């Protein structure tokens, strides 16, 4: 699944402004400015992270993501799947320039199976430069350039088919939008 999701991310057309065709319920999820981890936790008894890939990569391995970050010799890559009650909900890809990892940013390489949002949203120095939204094959995604103490990282989140982003509460339980 992680390879498929990672490949799919590379084919997404990104919008700098939310498109007019974006359903309101989905747009609310995509434009979430707080922790996506905390929002997802409201919809399940257990949120679990499976680490798919982690380690340093070269600038040549970034593709168009390179345009979203400052030039550096290497970047820390972390790819995960978040599961809500054992259902795959979100594929996350984080790219961190080596310079961001200096000082307190080094903790980003030691998160392991913990949700990134738990760490990031505890940091008082966290800011968000933007949220871009995108869609591919009926799946919605968002990417944000976040900064810790002024140093950037790129977080991309692909909402998988079983994610609550595609459901809305109805009279008879959750219904597909």
Swiss-Prot record:
Binding site for substrate: 36, 78, 116, 157
Swiss-Prot/TrEMBL catalytic activity: chorismate = 4-hydroxybenzoate + pyruvate
Pfam families assigned to the protein according to its UniProt record, in alphabetical order: Chor_lyase (PF04345)
Superkingdom assignment: Bacteria
Compartment(s) of residence: Cytoplasm
Keyword terms, alphabetized: Cytoplasm, Lyase, Pyruvate, Ubiquinone biosynthesis
GO MF term (any one): chorismate lyase activity
Matching InterPro entries: Chorismate--pyruvate_lyase, Chorismate_lyase_/UTRA_dom_sf
Leading EC class: lyase
One BP term from GO: pyruvate biosynthetic process
Cellular component, GO annotation: cytosol
Enzyme Commission number(s) of this protein: 4.1.3.40
Main subcellular localisation: cytoplasm
UniProt record similarity statement: Belongs to the UbiC family.
Protein name per its UniProtKB record: Chorismate pyruvate-lyase
Organism in which the protein naturally occurs: Pectobacterium atrosepticum (strain SCRI 1043 / ATCC BAA-672) (Erwinia carotovora subsp. atroseptica)
